Amino acid sequence: MVVIKDIVAREILDSRGNPTIEVDVSTEGGVFRAAVPSGASTGIYEALELRDKDPKRYLGKGVLNAVEIVRQEIKPALLGKDPCDQKGIDMLMVEQLDGTKNEWGYSKSKLGANAILGVSIACCRAGAASKGLPLYKYIATLAGKTIDKMVMPVPFFNVINGGEHAGNGLALQEFLIAPVGAPNIREAIRYGSETYHHLKNVIKNKYGLDATNVGDEGGFAPNVATAEEALNLLVEAIKAAGYEGKIKIAFDAAASEFYKQDEKKYDLDYKCKTKNASKHLTGEKLKEVYEGWLKKYPIISVEDPFDQDDFASFSAFTKDVGEKTQVIGDDILVTNILRIEKALKDKACNCLLLKVNQIGSVTEAIEACLLAQKSGWGVQVSHRSGETEDSFIADLVVGLRCGQIKSGSPCRSERLCKYNQLMRIEESLGADCVYAGESFRHPK
């Protein structure tokens, strides 16, 4: 039996220049590495990300405490363990070594989700190597999925950034393009890349060259003030690229970031110094705005249209548009089984955004995915705005047969490493895979 011989942790930098944790797990089969991402617009119900809070280092964002936790607490408990026992390893860390809980389950507030996840992903890679399987096939076996005919996901490219990801006036955080009409993942990525470059030219011609600077996820951040302006840019770019009908549009409102708790309203003007009362909308009024966009633009997916606790608005919106439009829960669900169960009961959305670092272990992420899929939801695997060169989520989305992934724009290496890995996987599978395409919500 292959066993864990050593675990090493270190502090590295993510794509925003902030510290994050990297973990190496060593077995007789080699050294297996994982780096943990970090979000900017984080849901309040996410598992705890442990930061040092030492103002003398990295403005308090260091992760040396998490590194020491791996070295001093996790490593001694896992030495000699079988890396193929993914659930056993994860639950040892989550339930026994940490054990902290809140109303939504294990909170990881002792060890930190970042420390636990780094070890969890590295062990997953070690387990795959021990079994002699590609990582995506090993993940499929962990989830009880078939490995006969794999599904390649539709990539959702974030090409215009707003919200907390950019310095413009846009309240909504992401505007995305999805090549559902492509024949395979390689062509889908080509469609996305070409449209991205056409979008750059459209923006340059309208707003000047300096408007083509990019945000945290590689999308452009032009100084547009309204969502309609951003959506019109996408329509123009898709047409210029020649992919009308083949590329659809999605957006992530990340509405928790502009929800005003004291007013019980959504402030679409929250990034502007001059306040406009007409931009402060109730959930009902904002729902009407969204529904107007759905009628006007080829939008197939909407993420976090309302605040993470506004289940009523989520439910009303999903009831009205959910048959034709994907309604994704991110901050409202945070990849948490108990939050998903509440949303299922309330019929609040119809798709889970799967972020492994929100919940903090591979096992819990797989369980969340399986619950969503069993309940008839879609599942979209997602990166974070603070990313690394780790391409784990590319293997995860294929292994779990989710049919859709978002990993930023076709720009910046920490985004492209996921898309490039998907092309490699498709190449290795050959005829043994299909592209999700129009069936991305419920891939066959």
Swiss-Prot record:
| Location(s), subcellular | Cytoplasm
Known CDD domains for this protein?
enolase
> Catalytic activity, per the record?
(2R)-2-phosphoglycerate = phosphoenolpyruvate + H2O
Catalytic center residues: 217, 355
Main site of residence?
cytoplasm
The pathway it acts in is: Carbohydrate degradation; glycolysis; pyruvate from D-glyceraldehyde 3-phosphate: step 4/5
Entry GO terms, CC:
phosphopyruvate hydratase complex
- Enzyme Commission code: 4.2.1.11
List UniProt keywords, sorted A-Z: Cytoplasm, Glycolysis, Lyase, Magnesium
Q: Name one GO molecular function term.
A: phosphopyruvate hydratase activity
Q: Which domain of life is it from?
A: Eukaryota
Q: What class of enzyme is it?
A: lyase
What residues does substrate bind to?
Answer: 165, 174, 303, 330, 382-385, 406
One Pfam family, short name? Enolase_C
> Which prosthetic group or cofactor does it need?
Mg(2+)
**What InterPro entries does this protein map onto?**
Enolase (IPR000941), Enolase-like_C_sf (IPR036849), Enolase-like_N (IPR029017), Enolase_C (IPR020810), Enolase_CS (IPR020809), Enolase_N (IPR020811)
- Please name the HAMAP family in this protein's record: Enolase
On assembly, the entry states:
Homodimer.
User: What's the protein here called?
Assistant: Enolase 1
- Native source organism of the sequence: Toxoplasma gondii
Q: Upper taxonomic classification of the species?
A: Eukaryota, Sar, Alveolata, Apicomplexa, Conoidasida
| Gene responsible for this protein | ENO1
